[in-house]
A protein has these predicted regions:
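Conserved small/polar residues in nucleotide/adenosyl-binding loops
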Residues: 2, 7-16, 497-504
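Class II aminoacyl-tRNA synthetase catalytic cores and aaRS-like
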Residues: 15-500
Length: 504
């Protein structure tokens, strides 16, 4: 501290802003002969006897430090990787340049070293390694885990993305407003996290699953356009398509807006943001719109990955007169795979094994091949009559050298299993379109659905506007009512939105 004060570096509590004249990622050949100060963490130490080399790392890069002074070498011999140090020294040109890093043309000859924080000799795991590290160990030593370059860069990328979103929403006239975190519970799709009230024993706050009610209040209060990077808390089991615990979403609301107005905002913000941070191809708006029922029929799921070219077709009518008992009285879904006849029996057995696993739950997976010769072979070929073959070719697009997978079950079950089989086929056959983000809207969701207990419940939430307005609620069968609810889907992942009900 005294040394820093004597050099006129101001209050010691502000020294982090005065600790270095350069970062570890910005020095180059133009800085040769300059005296610089650097601070960071030791990534690697190489003791060659006559001199010691240190790779010094900070958020911005790595600089090689050379220690050839005897006194400094004694000090350096006690240093360990991941120790935090401050050095001053002279920039010189490297004799053996490293083209893999931006600072590879230079090195710094140290004339002073200050240890800011010494690390233990043995780390619980290597920081920058391709080896798998146990998650519980990573979480226990999170401060070390976050030094990992990939993870570190992901967090910085998130920061840049959030700034881009904020700037774009501001450009579009949205005001950023933070809504309360502690609130009353409201009906949502998952369980609430509850916080006991100290002042009111026996009563609880709920952490918001989404800022639904508060943003409605903002619109009623006359705020025209609102947004926030909203924290959301959902107490649900972790699944591949869920974000359990805590996550953040771009949340926005508009006054006096139609569904198309919302789409325009999404199509302004989303492609712009994606293109700024990826080299992949990004769909431009307007995004295609797929009705919910069509999505379920063609893809077996309401968040389809459009990079996968396979579709599901209902071929029940083809087998109406079939004597294949396994199909009798069932809904039959088919997935036609171009060039699928090239695969051997092992592939089909593996797909059957997947379909009948506990994860999927199919009773079986029928299949057959349509060879180049025009012959139907393998699997259930003996049940594919000439009439069925003709229908599959003429009405459903079965082409030569293809294979067909059949799922037979009760309607909803067949639909669900076919959706999972389609996804798995896309993965195993490497059919997904490469380096592209495919967007679509899933629209016309049912307002209500039957619960497992047979009662009518909201499909998404009670805040959405029914198509046909309040009159539809009074005159239509609840299960026939569609809602102004729509999901934005990208490569099989989903973002949910809807048009708010404003009538009572």
């Amino acid at each position: 501290r005294d040394r820093l004060r004597s050099r006129g570096l101001g209050d010691v509590y502000k020294r982090q802003t005065m600790y270095r004249t350069k970062t570890c990622g910005e020095l180059n050949i133009n800085n040769v002969e300059e005296t610089v100060e650097l601070a960071g963490w030791i990534q690697k130490i190489r003791d060659l006897g006559a001199m010691i080399f240190i790779d010094l790392r900070d958020q911005f890069g790595i600089t090689q430090i050379v220690i050839n002074d005897e006194e400094l070498q004694k000090q350096a011999k006690d240093l360990t990787t991941e120790s935090c140090i401050h050095i001053s020294g002279k920039v010189v040109e490297r004799s053996n340049k490293n083209t893999k890093i931006p600072t590879g043309e230079i090195e710094v000859i140290a004339n002073e070293i200050e240890v800011l924080g010494k690390c233990k000799n043995v780390l619980p795991f290597e920081i920058n390694t391709d080896q798998e590290v146990r998650e519980d160990l990573r979480l226990e030593y999170r401060f070390l885990d976050l030094r990992n370059e990939k993870l570190h860069n992901n967090i910085l990328l998130r920061s840049k993305i959030l700034k881009t979103l904020r700037d774009k929403m501001d450009e579009l006239g949205f005001a950023e407003i933070q809504t309360p975190i502690l609130a009353n519970s409201s009906p949502e799709g998952a369980r609430d996290y509850l916080v006991p009230s100290r002042l009111n024993p026996g009563e609880f706050y709920a952490l918001p699953q989404a800022p639904q009610q508060f943003k409605q209040l903002l619109m009623v209060s006359g705020f025209d356009k609102y947004f926030q990077i909203a924290p959301c808390f959902r107490d649900e089991d972790p699944r591949a398509d869920r974000a359990p615990g805590e996550f953040y979403q771009l949340d926005f609301e508009m006054s006096f807006a139609t569904q198309e107005d919302v789409f325009k905002v999404i199509e302004e913000v989303v492609p712009y943001t994606f293109k700024k941070f990826t080299t992949w191809k990004v769909d431009e708006g307007p995004f295609i719109k797929i009705p919910y029922r069509e999505a379920m029929e063609k893809y077996g799921i309401d968040k389809p990955d459009l990079r996968n070219p396979l579709i599901i077709q209902d071929v029940t009518k083809c087998f109406e007169d079939s004597d294949f008992k396994a199909f009798e009285g069932k809904t039959i879904k088919a997935i036609i795979v171009p060039n699928g006849a090239e695969h051997g029996r092992k592939f089909f057995d593996k797909m059957t094994e997947y379909a009948t696993s506990d994860e999927v739950g199919a009773k079986g997976l029928a299949w057959t091949k349509y060879e180049e010769s025009g012959e139907v072979t393998g699997g259930i070929a003996k049940f594919i009559t000439d009439d069925i073959k003709e229908q599959l070719v003429n009405e459903f697009g079965m082409s030569k050298n293809s294979s067909v997978f059949f799922i037979a079950d009760e309607f909803k079950t067949a639909q669900k299993i076919a959706g999972l089989v389609r996804i798995e086929l896309g993965k195993r056959l490497d059919l997904l379109e490469k380096d592209v983000y495919r967007f679509c809207y899933i629209v016309d969701f049912p307002m209500y659905e039957l619960s497992d207990e047979g009662t009518i419940d909201f499909n998404h939430n009670p805040f959405s506007m029914p198509q046909g307005g309040m009159e539809a609620l009074e005159t239509k069968d609840p299960l026939d009512i569609l809602a102004y609810q729509y999901d934005l889907v990208c490569n099989g992942s989903v973002s949910y939105t809807h048009l708010r009900a404003h009538e009572t």
